[in-house]
Curated annotation (Swiss-Prot):
Similarity annotation: Belongs to the UreD family.
One Pfam family in the UniProt entry: UreD
UniProt keywords, alphabetically: Chaperone, Cytoplasm, Nickel insertion
Protein name: Urease accessory protein UreD
Biological source species: Halalkalibacterium halodurans (strain ATCC BAA-125 / DSM 18197 / FERM 7344 / JCM 9153 / C-125)
GO molecular function terms attached to this record: nickel cation binding
Domain of life: Bacteria
Keyword Endoplasmic reticulum part of the UniProt annotation: no
Amino acid sequence: MRASSHLPQLHGRLDLTFERRRGTTRLVASEQTPPLNVSRVLRTEEVDLATVYLVETSGGVVSGDSQTIAIYVGEGARVELIPQSATKVYPSRKQGESSTQQVWLRVDEGAAAFWKPESIIPFRKASFLQSTRFHLHSSSTFFYGDMLTPGRVHHNERFQYEQVDSLVEIYLDETLVVHDRVHLQPKDQLQTIGRLDGYSYYGAVWMHAPILKGAHLEQWMENGGQNDRFAYTCVAEGLIHVRWLSESSWRLRAALNDLYTAFRTFALKGE
């Protein structure tokens, strides 16, 4: 485990620029500071789509560690971003010290970015601060999702972390339309009404497309988990937010992945 007080702090950075050139989306600039890096571009679709894996080689973040990810998707480019693994947040090495992650993503006119959902696993005594900012053009296509777990449940760690503080901001045509903060502290009894209402897993998705409507979402989610709770909000024209509460990690993960696949197919193939 990297939580030893003798280990150096890691400050990973990943800067990626994608552009459409000669009819193909290309990764035209990449700056990587370990432990963050990116895979080579993969192409598995008939449509123009550049797929990359976002890699974190240290196995997790420790208090005092920081991660900064900045991704630019230029006009007409199409990108799929797949985290290689869950974000594991190790225990704080000293009181009041947190690990941090900052994400910035810009999706320009007619461009598309699909960020596949992955889990955040806060270990016992972990403190995690996350800030995520998206800049979208009204003609762009975008998907982002994640799942917060109660901890390492197979090690009998449920809600033993110090805090998870996550802020999402979304700008649509340079106007701030979303400022959404989720700040969870287990000492505040997360499973009471107004927190997690007795559930252990929390999932969230943000998605945008020019012709996206609530009716599309209702069709994709008509067979939602019987024992889960979910709701959606049409935040702005073409921008929808979905939240889940679940007692099953595999069921919530399946729901997130099913929605991701449905939206991706809709956006790329019009199906």
